[in-house]
A protein has these predicted regions:
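Catalytic cores of phosphodiester-bond hydrolases, prominently lipid phosphodiesterases
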Residues: 2-191
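A Trp-anchored, charged/polar loop motif used as the substrate-binding/catalytic surface
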Residues: 7-15, 87-91, 399-401, 429-446
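Loop/turn elements at helix/coil->beta-strand transitions in domains of secreted/extracellular proteins
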Residues: 25-28, 60-65, 138-145, 162-164, ...
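Second-shell loop/turn segments in exported
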Residues: 28-36, 118-123, 133, 146, ...
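Generic beta-strand/beta-sheet core signal
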Residues: 147, 170, 248, 335, ...
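N-terminal catalytic scaffold of extracellular/periplasmic and nuclease hydrolases
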Residues: 192-383, 389-405, 506-566
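Metal-dependent active-site segment of extracytoplasmic phospho-/sulfohydrolases and closely related
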Residues: 255, 480-517
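Active-site His/acidic residue clusters
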Residues: 343-349, 422-423, 448-451, 455-483
Length: 566
């Protein structure tokens, strides 16, 4: 009475006759009988009968559901007790229709049918036994639970996938945490999300990206997967001339993000590349890098302090790959599916000791060392605190356009600020980065008789990690993979193009928990909403691709690219 009934009665009084003030969900109280059935149950029902407004749904439709377990009376005795008292059922009993109406749920000792310890998977012969029980309970229209079962995330997801209705747990806070925000932990192409509506976002983005509107939950789905491009492997890993370099950076893209997208789509163009390495990506002043230090290391071949953009600890600018190729008379392109003043793209054209110094970084564009810049972020050009009419200054050298579609039509150097590139990837715009990549390649090829350099960033894989949003991560990965496919297609046509794919850091500590290789269903959880120091894959294709195998610091990538340009 003091442990359960009185607190529940108090709760109902405080919440206006329901268990939760702001929810229509009903509370179920399981009462386990340890002593003799009839006298114990008579005492329990007498106590509950004093509060019909709390325990009798005939009086209050929001009343607590009572389910009696343990020493349950024989089915023929169910009628001796008030109608609001329901009972735990036995899956092997053949109940009459009237008796079945008094069954609240079906409970089974897990150990009677399986010795699974919660690791790996249930062996098939035991799973068949469990599924037979589940099917019978559901055939009655009753929920089912297994007691005496193991605990843990693998168990929770396995039971969920099997259709088990109640998770029997001694760690409710852990179990509840696992199922919290469940729609953002699961993804399958062609399937509706488990939750719709609202926005999944994060407050962990930096100054230039903090206005990102987030991932629209009702759009975090794809009706079909993307095509996977199989390269011809023309000159792959050979000693041929490297004339062009396409450098693709998946911001926040770790191995788990790649694998999740691979299983969901049943293949990736990125994983068709045969030459692979691993890069270490620690910042100079911290174990875990930010995008400034990580992107700058990829751009310059030098280690950086966090927040520094292509600039030493002492404030000396480091030349980037863009400078290297520009000085060789080769056109340079910087393309991002995000803000052009964010850390990774600015590492390829700007210099600053503070990544948030957007005014200082974008002023570097006036040096004219980039032939093509494409991304979002018009406010960085129009809402300035330095008083510079940056668009006016840049128009002395560049065509300043507002749509990716306009890039190819312009003859000279182009800055394209297309605000649609600030949106999260979804079905309607999934090919946007790939389209921009194709247009950028065509533009630079027209200008570059000696060859060209193009950096392409998939920016929002990082945003999805900060938001702990697996559907967002997979869809952004597929958007990025389409851009990789465009680079590989051009490399096959051209024969003198090196393609390098990597990341600046991993975001979120994504761990894949379960999935289904046949259907493409993937389930994963994030251990953080920040960057992690995980080593990152490097993929290479084309002449010189074999130079990117092995394990090395991220600074080696830019150095090896430069070593291949004669």
């Amino acid at each position: 009475e003091s442990l359960y009934v009185e607190p529940i009665v108090t709760l109902f009084g405080r919440n206006g006759g329901r268990a939760w003030k702001d929810s229509d969900e009903r509370l179920q109280l399981m009462v386990e009988l340890k002593s003799a059935t009839e006298p114990t149950l008579q005492a329990v029902t007498a106590l509950l009968g004093r509060y019909p407004e709390v325990f009798d749904p005939a009086v209050n439709p929001e009343a607590v559901r009572i389910a009696v377990t343990g020493r349950v009376p024989a089915p023929e005795d169910f009628g001796k007790y008030p109608a609001y008292v329901r009972f735990d059922g036995n899956w092997e009993t053949d109940y009459t229709p009237g008796q079945l109406e008094r069954i609240a749920l079906v409970s089974v000792n897990f150990r009677t049918y399986s010795q699974w310890n919660g690791k790996g998977s249930i062996i098939p012969v035991e799973r068949v036994k469990l599924e037979k029980i589940i099917d019978r309970a559901h055939g009655w229209g009753k929920p089912v639970r297994f007691w005496g079962a193991p605990e843990g995330t693998t168990v929770y997801y396995t039971f969920y996938d099997m259709g088990i209705d109640y998770i029997n747990t001694d760690r409710p806070e852990v179990c509840a945490g696992f199922f919290d925000d469940f729609g953002n932990k699961n993804f399958q192409i062609g399937q509706r999300r488990t939750s719709v509506g609202g926005v999944t976002g994060t407050k962990r983005l930096d100054k230039t990206t903090r206005d990102f509107r987030g991932f629209q939950n009702d759009k975090l789905q794809l009706t079909e997967g993307i095509d996977v491009y199989t390269p011809t492997y023309r000159n792959d890993g050979g000693r041929g001339k490297v004339k062009n370099v396409i450098y693709l950076i998946g911001d926040g893209m770790g191995l788990s993000q790649i694998v999740a997208a691979f299983y969901a789509n049943k293949g990736l163009s990125t994983l068709q590349m045969k030459y692979m390495g691993l890069q270490q990506n620690n910042a100079l002043d911290a174990f875990t890098t930010d995008s400034a230090a990580g992107g700058s290391a990829l751009a310059t071949g030098e280690r950086h302090d966090n927040r520094h953009i292509s600039m030493s600890s002492e404030g000396e600018p480091y030349p980037s790959l863009s400078d290297f190729f520009h000085d060789k008379g080769m056109p340079v392109g910087v393309l991002t599916l995000g803000n052009v003043a964010d850390a990774t793209p600015t590492a390829f054209y700007g210099h600053s000791v503070e990544r948030d110094n957007a005014d200082e970084l974008t002023r570097c564009l006036m040096d004219g060392r980039v032939d093509l810049l494409c991304g979002s972020g018009i406010r960085e050009f129009t809402r300035r605190s330095d008083g510079v009419d940056l668009i006016g200054e840049l128009e002395k050298q560049y065509d300043f356009v507002r749509s990716v579609d306009e890039i190819k039509a312009r003859k000279g150097k182009v800055i394209c600020i297309d605000e649609t590139m600030d949106d999260a990837a979804e079905q309607a715009n999934l090919t946007l980065l790939a389209d921009a990549t194709r247009a950028s390649i065509a533009k630079l090829q027209e200008q570059g008789g000696k060859g060209f350099f193009l950096m392409v960033e998939g920016a929002k894989i990082d945003y999805a990690g900060h938001s702990r949003c697996l559907p967002g991560s997979i869809i952004e990965m597929l958007s990025f993979d389409l851009a990789v496919a465009e680079a590989l297609k051009f490399a096959d046509r051209n024969g003198e193009t090196l393609v390098v794919v990597t990341a600046d850091h991993e975001t979120g500590g994504l761990v894949l928990v379960d999935g289904d290789e046949r259907t493409g269903r993937v389930m994963g959880v994030y251990v953080s909403d920040d960057h992690t120091p995980a080593m990152l894959p490097v993929f290479a294709y084309g002449p010189g691709a074999d130079k990117f195998c092995g394990t090395y610091m991220n600074t080696e990538i830019a150095r090896r690219i430069k070593s291949l340009i004669k």
